[in-house]
Amino acid sequence: MAVEEGGCVTKRLQNELLQLLSSTTESISAFPVDDNDLTYWVGYITGPKDTPYSGLKFKVSLKFPQNYPFHPPMIKFLSPMWHPNVDKSGNICLDILKEKWSAVYNVETILLSLQSLLGEPNNRSPLNAVAAELWDADMEEYRKKVLACYEEIDDY
Amino acid sequence: MSSGTENDQFYSFDESDSSSIELYESHNTSEFTIHGLVFPKLISVTSQDSEFDINEDEDGVDTIYEGMLDAPLTKNNKRILCEGSVPNLSYECLTTKGIFERMLQRVDHLQPIFAIPSADILILLQHYDWNEERLLEVWTEKMDELLVELGLSTTANIKKDNDYNSHFREVEFKNDFTCIICCDKKDTETFALECGHEYCINCYRHYIKDKLHEGNIITCMDCSLALKNEDIDKVMGHPSSSKLMDSSIKSFVQKHNRNYKWCPFADCKSIVHLRDTSSLPEYTRLHYSPFVKCNSFHRFCFNCGFEVHSPADCKITTAWVKKARKESEILNWVLSHTKECPKCSVNIEKNGGCNHMVCSSCKYEFCWICEGPWAPHGKNFFQCTMYKNNEDNKSKNPQDANKTLKKYTFYYRLFNEHEVSAKLDWNLGQTLGTKVHALQERIGISWIDGQFLSESLKVLNEGRTVLKWSFAVAYYSDASHNLTKIFVDNQMLLANAVESLSELLQIKTPEVIMKRRPEFYNKAGYVENRTTALMECGRELLCKGICKAAE
């Protein structure tokens, strides 16, 4: 009795949406942009306390392939982001979104991982080399860069 | 017409060079004397092929390690044109199945040392790319850590209850099971390892199916515990782990491409394993090429992966092929020998360089390049704009571009003509079996006696291949040098010899074939001699730097 891939992804995403709506975590949230299309979501992440991103909110996009959850969603920062592991277009370098992906991960764990990445960048493989240098050298200047880059989310 | 005349000089016999040619030929003749016997044996000449035959002896050590075997070295007996010589290559031919069987033998051999199940050793070896030395080293240092690291053991404290243990690594049926992967609640078969991470059978199959083609160790979806081959087969319901092994071996061949090469011929699945690569630099230095032969008798160059390309070395071959690809659009167009008259469709063969064509049948005048009517082209040396545009696009100096194109066109046409002839000869080979059979039936000769036909065809094919690639060498050679002129003369001699032998092989009547048998021996022997001479002359051009690929 073979399960259709489309059916699998739909049921899975419906389940994830229900879990998120009932979640008590306030620092992250996500939902489909279009009620009729479960494969494209936007998510919101609050910067962790005691980091250069404290108090700031960031918007990301999540595009789910038909073979999700056996393959990871494509995630990008829609908000401008100054971070060693994020490039100018918002592309993210994070191992669990690539070779370390597992089908047991979900939207919540992904967003929480991104939130952790804000406070703990991986400076060994930076997409933004200047940010990687400043992180170690000058946190004050780093914070200034983050704020200079920051834009309030207008549809939150 | 003038360009034709200019090119003809390459093939013309120049009186002033006669002494050099005689000296060179005399040198070769003394090595390859043909006896005047009525039924002489075909002279066995040392050729590239004999150097690269697969070793018949089985090595005592049964391993696919790099550099673990002492390759038997035999000096090349051929006359040396410059310092040094190259040893015979020591290689073997394998298939993925053969490699896998060898891997299993190694696992069985190692099992008493490791004292763990064979399926576990298979995973350990897979992780260390079948480097047994490295594996044993790490195993000695940190045995338990290694098992945990590779997912063959768990630090979790699991109950040792016998009944509980029996539920792991088995497909079980569950009622009302909710799978956290597909979020479906249903009655379904499930699978789990000792870690207890349980998923429905469909999700596990989907997951494994994706992983089989990567060639990596497959783990639990939620932790690093490894699935063994038998686990994979249980989940999938049929022997799928062989696909994983295939992918693992392909990945292995890819990673070790200094020692392993896939046969480049279409649909051939052979892998050539070069045991000792230490002599390869010497091949390159002396402008030889490491030709090998797979189990299906496909011969190719281990270095660059192309077919056998003597007398060109890998550098010339690569440059020539690259140029051929770049120029192919123009050349396929320019080199068309015949076209239909646009008006009455009679086939017209182009002669000379003029693009102004007149159909001999209906007298229609048209342009050879664009096949349009000639009248709008006018006169006064007008060239077709299509051709002109191509030239303009190629270079800022149209005159130089045109000259380059003409030179290349000349050599490519010759290269291509012998490629086409080689295909025709291949078709000829298909009919040889019929002829040999007819010889046996009608005249009653033995199979052995009919072998001269097959041998002649083999010599013909090799001669054609060498002749074909010799035009690539000629293209990159300094045309003004004396040795290049000698090379061109050798080309002409081989071309004539090849055509002569090819003509002989067209004979259909078995009785006539047997009557003219001495001619087969003589002509095949001559082709073989001229082939060797051309190869050596070409190599000399390379060694002396007269032939070199411009960067």
Curated annotation (Swiss-Prot), chain A:
Documented EC number(s): 2.3.2.23
A Pfam family that the UniProt record links to this protein: UQ_con
A biological-process GO annotation: anaphase-promoting complex-dependent catabolic process
SUPFAM superfamilies in UniProt: UBC-like (SSF54495)
Pathway involvement of the protein, from the record: Protein modification; protein ubiquitination
Keyword terms: ATP-binding, Nucleotide-binding, Transferase, Ubl conjugation pathway
Disulfide bonding pattern of the chain: none
Source species of the chain: Saccharomyces cerevisiae (strain ATCC 204508 / S288c)
Protein name: Ubiquitin-conjugating enzyme E2-18 kDa
Signal peptide (from-to): none
GO cellular component, one term: nucleus
Function as written in the Swiss-Prot or TrEMBL entry: Catalyzes the covalent attachment of ubiquitin to other proteins.
GO MF term set: ATP binding; ubiquitin conjugating enzyme activity; ubiquitin-protein transferase activity
Top enzyme class: transferase
Chemical reaction(s) catalysed: S-ubiquitinyl-[E1 ubiquitin-activating enzyme]-L-cysteine + [E2 ubiquitin-conjugating enzyme]-L-cysteine = [E1 ubiquitin-activating enzyme]-L-cysteine + S-ubiquitinyl-[E2 ubiquitin-conjugating enzyme]-L-cysteine
Span of domain UBC core: 8-155
Family: Belongs to the ubiquitin-conjugating enzyme family.
Active site location: C93
UniProtKB/Swiss-Prot annotation, chain B:
Protein's UniProt keywords contain Metal-binding: yes
Binding site for Zn(2+) 3: C341, C344, C359, C362
Coiled-coil regions listed in the entry: none
Xref: CDD domains: BRcat_RBR_ANKIB1, Rcat_RBR_HHARI-like, RING-HC_RBR_HEL2-like
Reactions this protein catalyses: [E2 ubiquitin-conjugating enzyme]-S-ubiquitinyl-L-cysteine + [acceptor protein]-L-lysine = [E2 ubiquitin-conjugating enzyme]-L-cysteine + [acceptor protein]-N(6)-ubiquitinyl-L-lysine
GO terms, molecular function: ubiquitin conjugating enzyme binding; ubiquitin protein ligase activity; zinc ion binding
Zinc finger motifs (RING-type), residue ranges: 179-225, 341-370
Annotated pathway: Protein modification; protein ubiquitination
EC numbers for this chain: 2.3.2.31
Binding site for Zn(2+) 1: C179, C182, C200, C203
Keywords assigned by UniProt, alphabetized: Metal-binding, Repeat, Transferase, Ubl conjugation pathway, Zinc, Zinc-finger
Xref: InterPro entries: Ariadne, ARIH1-like_UBL, E3_UB_ligase_RBR, IBR_dom, TRIAD_supradom, Znf_C3HC4_RING-type, Znf_RING, Znf_RING/FYVE/PHD
Location of the region described as TRIAD supradomain in the Swiss-Prot/TrEMBL record: 175-388
Binding site for Zn(2+) 4: C367, C370, H377, C384
Binding site for Zn(2+) 2: C301, C304, H309, C314
One GO location term (cellular component): cytoplasm
Zinc finger IBR-type: from-to: 242-314
GO annotation (BP), single: histone catabolic process
Enzyme class: transferase
Annotated catalytic residues: C354
Domain notes: Members of the RBR family are atypical E3 ligases. They interact with the E2 conjugating enzyme UBE2L3 and function like HECT-type E3 enzymes: they bind E2s via the first RING domain, but require an obligate trans-thiolation step during the ubiquitin transfer, requiring a conserved cysteine residue in the second RING domain.
PANTHER family: RBR FAMILY RING FINGER AND IBR DOMAIN-CONTAINING (PTHR11685)
Oligomeric form and interacting partners: Interacts with the E2 ubiquitin-conjugating enzyme UBC4 and histones H3 and H4.
Function text: Probable ubiquitin-protein ligase involved in the degradation-related ubiquitination of histones. Contributes to the post-translational regulation of histone protein levels by polyubiquitination of excess histones for subsequent degradation.
Other facts noted in the record for this chain: Present with 2250 molecules/cell in log phase SD medium.
Record's protein name: E3 ubiquitin-protein ligase HEL1
Gene: HEL1
